[in-house]
Amino acid sequence: MYQLPTSINIGGKEFRIRNKGDYRMVLDCMLALEDVELDEVERLTSCLIIFYEDINNYEELEKLPDIEVAAKEMIRFFNLGRDDKPGLKTNYNLIDYEKDEQLICSAVNNVAGLEIRTVPYCHWWTFMGYYMAIGESTLATIVGIRYKIASHQKLEKYEIKFKNENPQYFNMDYRSISDRQLSEEFLREVWNQNK
């Protein structure tokens, strides 16, 4: 309780989280998971290699005693130690961590009271604490409008004006996405594990 985890216990063995769970490493994982040029297996494999400090290539994945648990615990870490994803439940990507970098950092900087990109280390959970404390901001306005567009809600006049004046923030793919469930069956199939 009230600890920032820097390792994951898998089968009684501790596996270090790369860079002690720094937010930049997690954002790299998010980019890997969203990489449309990779298939699902490659996305998950890339993400596990980025996430676990002692896993640096595909062959080293065998060091993990249970790939399924390793993947589930990684996702649990992303979700701030929760089994379910915190925040707004939606079937749409409302944030693009790469394209929205300046907006995200500006809003987080305002909450944190410093330029977050200049600190050598900031744990993912700390970063997300700042992120969840973002109040009224350009980012909040943009995400609110994106949500309305994605869910086919009518925009207010000021939102239409903002959208028309800032089209660069609204050229996203609003098609529905499916939450990738790291199901036992899928992971066994991917990793050829038989239990």
Regions found by a protein language model. Name each.
Residues D22, D28, D35, D39, ...:
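Acidic-enriched, low-complexity/disordered segments with a strong bias for Aspartate over Glutamate
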Residues T45-G87:
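A glycine-rich, hydrophobic loop/mini-helix early in the fold
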